[in-house]
């Protein structure tokens, strides 16, 4: 499981209803942030009885209320596909991650295949309008534009529709 890589003090950005919380290592110390108070209430219920220490925080993930370098690991799952431009939030992840810490990202992205990629480009306008989902993001480019260093990148799922990236704050 991808989130087993998380260590130290962990920030989950866009925690939603807490679906990831059971997958963090036992004994983890997690700050779970989301803009939606309703989602956080559901996350609190889901977290009951888990072997992790969780603090919930209502916050805008692009303007976090934490000092620089406050977390060893920052993570997000399927959050940035809902943003037209995730670069400011990626910069914020870099800011609150300690030097030498890790940034874990999992999102759906554009499939880089001759027919599928252009089809996704055509469908993107509709998916943004109907569901608020940007299906043509190129996360590698966004991560680099935010000044972060990519340590590992894996395409997952059917034709690589998902991308898992491990990054760290730039030097």
Explain the meaning of each model-derived region.
Residues 62-74:
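A short acidic, Gly/Pro-enriched loop at the edge of an enzyme's catalytic core
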Residues 9-63:
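Class I SAM-dependent methyltransferase SAM/SAH-binding core
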Residues 29, 100-102:
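Short glycine-centered segments of the SAM/dcSAM-binding site in methyltransferase folds
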Residues 72-85:
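A short SAM/SAH-binding and catalytic strip from SAM-dependent methyltransferases
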Residues 91, 104-162:
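C-terminal alpha-helical "lid/dimerization" subdomain adjacent to the S-adenosyl-L-methionine
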Residues 164-171:
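C-terminal lobe and adjacent flexible extensions of AdoMet/dcAdoMet transferase-like proteins
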Residues 87-99:
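A short glycine-rich, Lys/Arg-flanked "PGG" loop and its adjoining helix->strand segment in the class I
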């Amino acid at each position: 499981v991808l989130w087993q890589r998380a260590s130290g003090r962990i920030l989950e950005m866009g925690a939603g209803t807490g679906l990831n919380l059971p997958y963090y290592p036992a004994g983890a110390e997690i700050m779970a942030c989301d803009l939606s108070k309703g989602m956080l209430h559901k996350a609190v219920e889901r977290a009951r009885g888990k072997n992790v220490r969780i603090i919930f925080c209502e916050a805008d993930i692009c303007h976090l209320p934490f000092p620089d370098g406050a977390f060893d690991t920052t993570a997000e799952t399927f959050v940035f596909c809902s943003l037209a431009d995730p670069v400011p939030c990626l910069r914020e992840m870099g800011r609150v991650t300690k030097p030498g810490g890790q940034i874990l990202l999992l999102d759906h992205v554009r499939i880089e295949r001759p027919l599928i990629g252009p089809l996704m480009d055509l469908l993107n306008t509709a998916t943004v309008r109907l569901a608020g989902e940007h299906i043509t993001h190129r996360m590698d480019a966004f991560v680099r534009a935010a000044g972060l260093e990519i340590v590992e990148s894996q395409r997952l799922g059917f034709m690589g529709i998902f991308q898992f990236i491990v990054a760290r704050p730039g030097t």
